A protein has these predicted regions:
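Switch/connector loops and helix/strand junctions flanking conserved nucleotide-binding motifs
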Residues: 84-87, 114-121, 129, 147, ...
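Short glycine-/polar-rich loops that comprise or flank the Walker A/P-loop
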Residues: 38, 70-73, 101-106, 152-155
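Conserved nucleotide-sensing/catalytic segment adjacent to the nucleotide-binding pocket
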Residues: 36-98
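Conserved phosphate-donor/acceptor-positioning beta-strand/loop module used by diverse small-molecule
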Residues: 101-125, 158-161
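Extreme N-terminal, non-catalytic leader segments
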Residues: 1-16, 51-64
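Glycine-rich phosphate-binding P-loop
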Residues: 19-35
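Small-molecule kinase domains that catalyze NTP-dependent phosphoryl transfer to phosphate-bearing small molecules
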Residues: 130-168
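Pre-Walker A (Motif I) flank of P-loop NTPase domains
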Residues: 13-18, 71-74
Length: 169
C-alpha cells in the first residue's frame, strides 16, 4: 500500500495527526524528519501519557475554530522506551483518539527484519534500548512482543528492511 494518500489529503474539517511507531532501528526518527520536510510539525519520543494532552489540545483548537483541516498536520513519534509503556494501553488511547471530532488520527508502524535491525545496531555501535545489558536480538524480541498489539491496529505497516534510512523520504 502506498503511504501517499495517508500523508497528503486530510479529510474535510479534520486536522491530520500521524502517529509514527515501530521497532527501534526501523527508521522512526528518519521518517519524522522526512514528514517535517513536507510540512508536518514533528514531535519525537513523546511519552505515551502525554499523547492525550497534546492531541486533546489540538482538538480543543479545532473545536474553538482556531484550527481547521488546513492547519499544519502533526506527526508524533512514540515507541516502547517510554516509562510504563504498554502496547495495549497505546492501542486503547489510539482507539479513543480516533473518536475525537476534527482530528484524523492515522497510525503508521515501521517494521524491519531482525537481521537488518541487528546489523543497524552493530553499525552504529548502539545498544538496543530494551536490552542495555543483553544482546540486541533479546531487545528486538522483547520489543516485538510489547509492540504486537500496536502493529495489529496500524493503518499502514512499512517494512524498512530493504531501505536505507536516507531512503525513508
Amino acid at each position: 500500500a502506498s503511504a501517499a494518500p495517508l500523508l497528503h489529503s486530510a479529510k474535510q474539517d479534520r486536522r491530520r495527526v500521524l502517529l509514527i511507531s515501530g521497532l527501534a532501528g526501523a527508521g522512526r526518527t528518519s521518517a519524522l524528519r522526512a514528514l517535517e520536510d513536507i510540512g508536518y510539525e514533528a514531535v519525537d519520543n513523546l511519552p505515551l501519557e502525554l499523547l492525550p494532552h497534546l492531541v486533546g489540545g489540538l482538538a480543543a483548537e479545532a473545536d474553538s475554530g482556531r484550527a481547521a483541516s488546513g492547519e499544519q498536520p502533526i506527526a508524533i513519534g512514540i515507541d516502547c522506551r517510554s516509562r510504563g509503556f504498554s502496547g495495549r494501553d497505546f492501542v486503547e488511547r489510539i482507539q479513543k483518539l480516533r473518536t475525537t471530532p476534527h482530528l484524523e488520527v492515522i497510525l503508521i508502524y515501521l517494521d524491519c527484519e531482525d537481521e537488518v535491525l541487528i546489523r543497524r545496531f552493530t553499525e552504529t555501535r548502539r545498544r538496543h534500548p530494551l536490552a542495555p545489558d543483553r544482546g540486541v536480538a533479546d531487545g528486538i524480541a522483547r520489543e516485538r512482543s510489547l509492540m504486537f498489539p500496536v502493529r495489529g491496529m496500524a493503518d499502514l505497516v512499512i517494512d524498512t528492511s530493504t531501505r536505507p534510512n536516507a531512503d525513508l523520504k
